[in-house]
């Protein structure tokens, strides 16, 4: 039986950031399971002796988890695998080393970190994984994901004339998309709108919609602090066939067609989704951040003893 070169690969996190990885190789025969077990039992001895290489980019722990969720992480170790003449599909064991110590939360196979491996819980059952449910031809269908997570409910509320609740959920949807795009930073709501949504057709700007969002989400009124101070014009949504309406008088609230705004945000989501087609690093940020969200369409159903 031929010997195969197999690899213990280590990602070194120091002070919360990974900049380097290490590789220690072995030559073994036997089944893949036996080879993997050999690598696992040598983790403690191998990681201090591994040859170190620079990662092509730095990773936080959350970013590295997202990279494993997305797919083939071996691309980040190409320099070492080329140097050691690895086979196209090498047997490997990948372990994080956190401040000098192996950190193993769970053991998984070589495939992408998805589905029940990520979402299963003994207490809460299994949560659907959007990277499984919404991937078609190796591409994530972002418009369908956002439709199911937000716009089904937004349309349901609108069609049932629950316009205030509909507006609140629309603002929450923009909040989520802005966080996913720009992270938790000031101005992300307005930045997302300015980048992807045409608001001028509605006679408003992103700052005005941000202040409207603050008032309607937090207090269910139309008067944020900046609106009350006179620094920003107030907005009042309406539902009707007229796409726009003039303000009743100078300084009075600007009318905003709610249906028109929903349509404009939906168009913006299409443009936003297109921006992920070619940018892998941006997609990693999406997975890192969207993993933190919750949704009506991704709920766990689990049996409770004594109940049906």
Residue ranges and their predicted role:
Residues 1-130, 195-198, 204, 280-308:
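Terminal, compositionally biased low-complexity regions
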Residues 129-138:
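Boundary/linker elements of alpha-helical solenoid repeat scaffolds
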Residues 137-145, 176:
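Alpha-helical solenoid scaffolds in large eukaryotic transport, assembly, and signaling factors
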Residues 147, 154, 166, 206-209:
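Hydrophobic packing residues in well-ordered alpha-helices of helical domains and bundles
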Residues 153-194:
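Short, contiguous, well-structured surface segments enriched in hydrophobic/aromatic residues
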Residues 176-183, 195, 199, 215-223:
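Amphipathic alpha-helical interaction surfaces
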Residues 201-282, 287-292, 296-299:
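Long, charged low-complexity segments
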């Amino acid at each position: 039986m031929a010997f195969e070169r197999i690899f213990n690969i280590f990602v070194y996190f120091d002070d919360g950031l990974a900049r380097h990885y290490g590789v220690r190789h072995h030559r073994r025969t036997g089944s893949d399971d036996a080879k993997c077990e050999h690598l696992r039992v040598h983790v403690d001895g191998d990681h201090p002796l591994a040859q170190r290489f620079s990662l092509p980019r730095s990773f936080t722990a959350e970013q590295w988890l997202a990279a494993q969720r997305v797919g083939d992480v071996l691309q980040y170790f190409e320099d070492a695998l080329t140097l050691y003449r690895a086979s196209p599909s090498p047997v490997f064991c990948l372990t994080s080393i956190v401040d000098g110590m192996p950190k193993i939360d769970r053991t998984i196979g070589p495939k992408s970190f998805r589905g029940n491996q990520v979402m299963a819980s003994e207490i809460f059952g299994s949560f659907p994984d959007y990277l499984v449910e919404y991937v078609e031809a190796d591409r994530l269908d972002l418009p369908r994901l956002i439709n199911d997570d937000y716009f089904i409910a937004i349309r349901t509320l609108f069609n049932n004339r629950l316009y205030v609740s509909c507006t609140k959920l629309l603002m929450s949807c923009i909040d989520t998309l802005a966080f996913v795009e720009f992270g938790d930073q000031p101005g992300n709501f307005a930045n997302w709108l300015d980048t992807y949504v045409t608001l001028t057709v509605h006679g408003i700007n992103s700052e005005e919609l941000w202040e409207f969002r603050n008032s309607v989400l937090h207090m269910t009124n139309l008067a944020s602090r900046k609106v009350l101070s006179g620094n920003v014009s107030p907005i009042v949504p309406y539902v009707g066939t007229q796409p726009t309406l003039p303000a009743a008088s100078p300084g009075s609230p600007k009318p905003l067609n709610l249906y028109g705004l929903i349509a404009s945000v939906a168009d913006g989501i299409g443009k936003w989704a297109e921006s992920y087609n070619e940018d892998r690093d941006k997609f990693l940020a999406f997975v890192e951040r969207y993993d933190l969200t919750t949704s009506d369409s991704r709920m766990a159903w689990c049996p409770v003893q004594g109940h049906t």
